[in-house]
Amino acid sequence: MQHADALYLFNEGRNNQAYRLLGAHADVSGTTFRVWAPNAGRVSVVGDFNGWHGDVHPLLPLGESGVWEATVAEANPGNLYRFEVTNRHTGDKLIKSDPYGRGFELRPGSAAYIVPPSTYAWGDAGWLQQRAGWDWQQAPVNIYEVHPGSWMRHPGGKPYLWGELAERLIPYALAQGY
């Protein structure tokens, strides 16, 4: 999808792949950052690649879309970053986490880190073909939301690790009809 089409659909509220447009996208030329900040007068990306200085890498608005963009050659996978957003009405500067970030530092930090492009080879062509024949608009919706840290714990109160949790949660969800 071309950027103009992606921006148009995003502003229409119909871009169901906005994660491909927004966030941080690393390639051989560096990392392209895009963020939607429609009320901003100025946006810049700050990170460990520029000493967290907001004057070094300003983003440019993409027309009237509310999306801001910059490509930073020095920004590489593993670097931490956030956005410095200046409110166009008040002039207030805020440091914001990337809502489309794909990796984040551990608490108490809240910066995103640049994730390298995926090299994962999907093997779900059969499932996608089966799904294409499914009329999802006529099917019931069944959503199960779980907070992993509180859903189930070891008898002493220690949270399960992700693998341990998966061993328990997946059979439980299947038994509930998910």
Residue ranges and their predicted role:
Residues 55-63:
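Short, surface-exposed loop motifs enriched in S/T, G, D/E and P with embedded aromatic residues
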Residues 39, 53, 77-79:
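Short loop/turn segments at connectors of secondary-structure elements within structured domains
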Residues 1-32, 62-157, 164, 169:
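The feature marks proteins involved in alpha-glucan
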Residues 160, 172-178:
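Aromatic-lined carbohydrate-binding/catalytic grooves of carbohydrate-active enzymes
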Residues 43-45, 81:
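Short beta-strand elements bearing conserved aromatic residues within extracellular beta-rich modules
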